[in-house]
Amino acid sequence: MSPSAGFQFSLYFLQTKKVLWKLTGLCYILLFTLCFFADQENGGKALASPPGIWKRADVTFDSNTAFSSLVVSANKKTVKNVGVPQVVPDNPERFNSSPCVLGSPGFRSGKHYFEVKYGTQREWAVGLAGKSVKRKGNLNLVPEERIWQTGLWWLRHLETDPGRVHSTSGKITVFVDYSGGNVIFDLNRIITILKANFSGEEVVPFFYLGGTVSLTTL
């Protein structure tokens, strides 16, 4: 079963105006999680909504934006932090202080999702960034800097939950509802919902990789 089918009912139900008017905060998150698990229990069929709501994005890494220690594979589907700066052009699109890289395609409308495989390493984040995200100088991974993300960390206060530590590899799925202003993460069945004000700006996949981390888009 594809992630799109697994979330069809849950996301459609939660994002109707009638429900959004009534549900806020923890209630919103709780109901979303219950719907997700109910859908999984029924094989993703009993609660499935009409097809075509969520479009799968074939995401690749943009090497022109990659920090100097991040090496992008020839097929642009894998990126690894090799820990040693590489000789790369200091073009305007490139992050020069934070180990980050952007992906494509970008999104200006609609509902989309993409999947990323991660290993046993910590200190990584996956999400979305505005096209205008700062490339030069220190970067904080917060909405105020046009970044919406989650991931696994040893410790990073204020930017994500430092308690989410897993010892195994896995997959994270990122859902973006552009018009609804929602970014939704499924990380090992932990559902995180972030409200986002995209302000009409194109948003693109965003990745942060600490030392020795490798990520692969699926």
Curated annotation (Swiss-Prot):
Every B30.2/SPRY domain range: 49-155
Propeptide section residues: 41-48, 156-218
User: Looking at the record's lineage, which domain of life comes first?
Assistant: Eukaryota
Q: Name one GO molecular function term.
A: toxin activity
Q: Name one GO cellular component term.
A: extracellular region
PANTHER family in UniProt: E3 UBIQUITIN-PROTEIN LIGASE TRIM
* Annotated function: Neurotoxin that produces dose-dependent hypolocomotion and hyperalgesia in mice. May directly act on the central nervous system, as it is 6500-fold more potent when administered intracerebroventricularly than intraperitoneal.
What is the protein name given in its UniProt record?
Ohanin-like protein
- Native organism is Lachesis muta muta
Phylogenetic lineage? Eukaryota, Metazoa, Chordata, Craniata, Vertebrata
